[in-house]
């Protein structure tokens, strides 16, 4: 079963516009999240789904897979679903990691993936 960890990311936050590109220790926040997700041992793909060209270009410049989604995607789950349906048809499992989780533990994503692979009803 092929597994993708998708990081939905948007620029137009009401409380903190541009948060994904805000610098944290000299790097954009979204890059910290990508680095954590890439440490997942069970994921076949780590990618970002965004509706913003600035985020798209930044993520691409760091060599990560990134998918452009329409602005009509109102939630991160909508962005993940769009990317899955449009670009990742041969994947079976999708894990949603929010773009503002720079301290996300990759082992937790691996546990989720293992659970999903073991229990086909989930």
Indicate residue ranges for each PLM-predicted region.
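Conserved acidic residues
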Residues: 3, 44, 92, 121-122
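Short beta-strand-to-loop acidic/aromatic patch adjacent to the donor-nucleotide binding site
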Residues: 80-83, 90-102
